[in-house]
Amino acid sequence: MAPAADMTSLPLGVKVEDSAFGKPAGGGAGQAPSAAAATAAAMGADEEGAKPKVSPSLLPFSVEALMADHRKPGAKESALAPSEGAQAAGGPAQPLGVPPGSLGAPDAPSSPRPLGHFSVGGLLKLPEDALVKAESPEKPERTPWMQSPRFSPPPARRLSPPACTLRKHKTNRKPRTPFTTAQLLALERKFRQKQYLSIAERAEFSSSLSLTETQVKIWFQNRRAKAKRLQEAELEKLKMAAKPMLPPAAFGLSFPLGGPAAVAAAAGASLYGASGPFQRAALPVAPVGLYTAHVGYSMYHLT
């Protein structure tokens, strides 16, 4: 029972070197080493007890603190008590085992960060009215082709036809003189007799027609311009009639002497041979050009 008594006399946590199985054969010689081991173990236990024991709940990065939703009220008060005492003494102090800057960080509410318009949080925070309003077709920034369900092109703008610009006359322009039928016949008869009137003749003729000299003068000027245009048109027509008609060779059609009949005879000779028994002599045919009249000449006389 001696080994059992030695084990109970040692304090808790001391490693026992001597046991019932490892005790040396000599009983008296083994008593001194066991007493020295007991004193060394007691001193180690005192040193460990002198060290401050930190509860794992005070550490913010411990497993218990990470798994728990919030700290215990007691732990919070015990962690804040040393810091309040240190502030009252005049110097900043932190609780033992807590890293600097981590005190009160989990409990202090973090300042809300501004959410962007295109971030996930910003889109989730937007109300439904804002989303519906953004998608509504009444938004002025949207183009007409985006409002259409089929993305049809915008309708073409109807451009009003340009206004017809009329020729602007002078403001002091005199109105056109309405000549009567008798006056026109008398003016035309006088123009055939003489195209240019002298000053005396124009004064006498205008008084007989109850017209002014300026009206008679302008009418004769216009009538001479009209006669000149008609004369130029007649000359152009005579020039066109005097030009000879182009011969058929100009159009790529050339006939040999004898006309189309000679062409047919030559084709038959080449087909049957020159010495064929059924060959017939072709009658001479007068050229077609001898019987054709000049087209321009006939047109000139018809006009």
UniProtKB/Swiss-Prot annotation:
Region (Disordered): 18-56, 69-120, 133-163
UniProt keyword terms in alphabetical order: Developmental protein, DNA-binding, Homeobox, Isopeptide bond, Nucleus, Repressor, Transcription, Transcription regulation, Ubl conjugation
Protein species of origin: Macaca mulatta (Rhesus macaque)
Biased composition (Low complexity): 31-44, 81-101
Superkingdom to which the source organism belongs: Eukaryota
DNA-binding region: 172-231
PROSITE patterns, sorted: HOMEOBOX_1, HOMEOBOX_2
UniProt subcellular location: Nucleus
Glycyl lysine isopeptide (Lys-Gly) (interchain with G-Cter in SUMO), cross-linked positions: K15, K133
Name of the protein in its database record: Homeobox protein MSX-1
GO molecular function terms listed in the Swiss-Prot or TrEMBL record: cis-regulatory region sequence-specific DNA binding; DNA-binding transcription activator activity, RNA polymerase II-specific; DNA-binding transcription factor activity, RNA polymerase II-specific; DNA-binding transcription repressor activity, RNA polymerase II-specific; p53 binding; RNA polymerase II transcription regulatory region sequence-specific DNA binding; transcription cis-regulatory region binding
Purpose: Acts as a transcriptional repressor. Capable of transcription autoinactivation. Binds to the consensus sequence 5'-C/GTAAT-3' in downstream activin regulatory elements (DARE) in the gene promoter, thereby repressing the transcription of CGA/alpha-GSU and GNRHR. Represses transcription of myoblast differentiation factors. Binds to core enhancer regions in target gene promoters of myoblast differentiation factors with binding specificity facilitated by interaction with PIAS1.
Assembly information from the UniProt record: Interacts with CREBBP/CBP, TBP and SP1; interaction with these transcription activators may inhibit autoinactivation. Interacts (via C-terminus) with PIAS1 (via N-terminus); the interaction is required for the localization of both proteins to the nuclear periphery and specific binding of MSX1 to the core enhancer region in target gene promoters. Interacts with H1-5.
Chief localisation class: nucleus
Biased composition (Basic and acidic residues): 133-142
InterPro entries linked: HD, HD_metazoa, Homeobox_CS, Homeodomain-like_sf, Msh_Homeobox_Regulators
Keyword Ubl conjugation: yes
Entry similarity comment: Belongs to the Msh homeobox family.
Entry comment on modification after translation: Sumoylated by PIAS1, desumoylated by SENP1. Sumoylation of Lys-15 and Lys-133 not required for interaction with H1-5, transcriptional repression, inhibition of myoblast differentiation, or binding to gene promoters.
Cellular component aspect of the GO annotation: nuclear periphery; nucleoplasm; nucleus; transcription regulator complex
Any Gene Ontology biological process: odontogenesis of dentin-containing tooth
